[in-house]
């Protein structure tokens, strides 16, 4: 999996940062997939500065209905139609997302020439496509807001081909059945159980993408043990009370959560427009003083998961 940050500013855009949007490139050999998390104003323009085609976009996850996470959605949906894209698209989001999209399209006389499904979610598992599952967790914000935990299913362990050959199993289609954990019967009547020749499963990757939030009970469960946690760091330590009063988090709170949850890497984003490049580096240093494995997302920064 690969994360591409299209917008990293909180509330309003700046000269160097657009408002929130994150691409997740799933990079699976047998299944293409491009997911978008939040869609602030100007997201489709940001997308033009990447190598990704909107036609590959098949799922959009909206954390909440504040404009800096949402106002780019109608334009992206319409441009997708005007480009002749016919691939289906599914939008997941809190209550009200359906009304917002349908109203924007209706009032502007717009439509989509592709199947568009809108799923209004609550807390819990919202998707399992056979390769990975997505679970929504409620966060602490003035509007209904969710964070998303994306977990790949474990992959089968490697097949011990050498041991199978030694047991008289010819390479070919039988290996595929054994790789799937099935039991086969050889011509001499022997039964071979694939599970006996498989290494331990390879754990799938896990990723937590937070929407806007102050400290909350669900945060630890959302982030527990993930390889990468994406979390807002809207304000620095000295402005923590102000951040919390508006449903946001400070650098200290983001980094402390990462440490307590045992995550592999913390990526901070959604930084206040009050911070210039020097100020953003200060935010990064504050986080690293608590959780050293912290990175700062800038627009168009790419991270592997």
UniProtKB/Swiss-Prot annotation:
Cofactor descriptive note: Binds 2 Zn(2+) ions.
Signal peptide feature range: none
Catalytic activity, EC: 3.1.-.-
GO molecular function, one term: zinc ion binding
Cofactor(s) listed in the protein's UniProt record: Zn(2+)
Binding-site list for Zn(2+) 2: 68-69, 212, 270
Residues bound to Zn(2+) 1: 64, 66, 141, 212
Keyword tags: Endonuclease, Exonuclease, Hydrolase, Metal-binding, Nuclease, tRNA processing, Zinc
Zinc keyword on record: yes
Metal-binding recorded as keyword: yes
Catalytic center residues: 68
Function: Zinc phosphodiesterase, which has both exoribonuclease and endoribonuclease activities.
Family statement: Belongs to the RNase Z family. RNase BN subfamily.
Subunit structure: Homodimer.
Protein name as catalogued: Ribonuclease BN
Gene behind the chain: rbn
């Amino acid at each position: 999996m690969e994360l591409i940050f299209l917008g990293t500013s909180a509330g309003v855009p700046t000269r160097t940062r657009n408002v929130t949007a994150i691409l997740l490139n799933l990079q699976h050999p047998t299944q293409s997939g491009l997911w978008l998390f939040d869609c602030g104003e100007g997201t489709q323009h940001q997308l033009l500065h990447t190598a990704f085609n909107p036609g590959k976009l098949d799922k959009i996850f909206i954390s909440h209905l504040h404009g800096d996470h949402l106002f780019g959605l109608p334009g992206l949906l319409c441009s997708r139609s005007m480009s002749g894209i016919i691939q289906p698209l599914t939008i997941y989001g809190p209550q009200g997302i359906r009304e917002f999209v349908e109203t924007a399209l209706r009032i502007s006389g717009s439509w989509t020439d592709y199947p568009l499904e809108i799923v209004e979610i609550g807390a819990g598992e919202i998707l399992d496509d056979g390769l990975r599952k997505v679970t929504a967790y409620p966060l602490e914000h003035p509007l209904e807001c969710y964070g998303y935990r994306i977990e790949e299913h474990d992959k089968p362990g490697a097949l011990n081909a050498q041991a199978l050959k030694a047991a008289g199993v010819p390479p070919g289609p039988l290996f595929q059945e054994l790789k799937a954990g099935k039991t086969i019967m050889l011509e001499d009547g022997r039964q071979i159980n694939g599970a006996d020749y498989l290494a331990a499963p390879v754990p799938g990757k896990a990723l937590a993408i937070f929407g806007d939030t102050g400290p909350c009970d669900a945060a630890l469960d959302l982030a527990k043990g993930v390889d990468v946690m994406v979390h807002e760091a809207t304000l620095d330590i000295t402005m923590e009370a102000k951040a919390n009063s508006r449903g946001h988090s400070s650098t200290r709170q983001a980094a402390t959560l990462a440490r307590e949850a045992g995550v592999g890497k913390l990526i901070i984003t959604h930084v206040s427009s009050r911070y210039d490049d020097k100020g953003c580096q200060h935010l990064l240093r504050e986080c690293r003083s608590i959780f050293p494995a912290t990175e700062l997302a800038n627009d168009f920064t790419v991270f592997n998961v």
